[in-house]
Amino acid sequence: MTGKTGKKNYLDFGVLDKQEIVFSQLLKKNGYKTLIAGKWQLGKEKNLPYHFGFDEHILWQHKLSRTDSLGHDTRYPNPVLEVNGENKKFKNGSFGPNLIVDYINDFVNKNKDEKFLVYYPMLLTHCPFVPTPDSDDFDPEDNGSKIYRGNAKYFGDMVSYMDKMVGRIFDNLKKQNLLKNTLIIFTSDNGNDAPIVSLNSEGEVLWGKGQTTDNGTHVPLI
């Protein structure tokens, strides 16, 4: 967000220095409507999303921890998300990524005649690896995994669902006739986490998150 490597401005895990200038502040200063939607993990102070230039936010892990009082991860099935400063528990089989993309598309629709920024640090495909609403064994009564990594067999389902969520955003931009005038950047912050093994045209790609290896540092940029 700052254009700097972590070596130059790292304070602590999950902390973004308030003295830093980030791209959302620059765009807001130049008349853009701004939204951050997804994972926060940049500090727990109440006003931080606004401080860093976001008019609106729908976030996981801002003021609250990643688990509830019973140890359930709170980002995927029936999640707890912060919507513009208010923590909300969603029920009835809702799924965090769906709710976030709903908000993104609503934000785009109401600002389609303005300059806008959507920063979408998506929840998917981070562990815990869990069923999605498209999985055969998705449980609408589930309140989240108690196991940090979940079950790696669901990683493929989560990748497919990520693709579906990106597709929903593209489809909405197309519907609003905004695709030709919208810059979309798709990237990541690290390689796969253990124990995930992916495939490409050359064969298997082992996990590497947290390692200073190609598998840990090479990410998509589209």
Describe the residue ranges of each PLM region.
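Formylglycine-dependent sulfatase
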Residues: 1-222
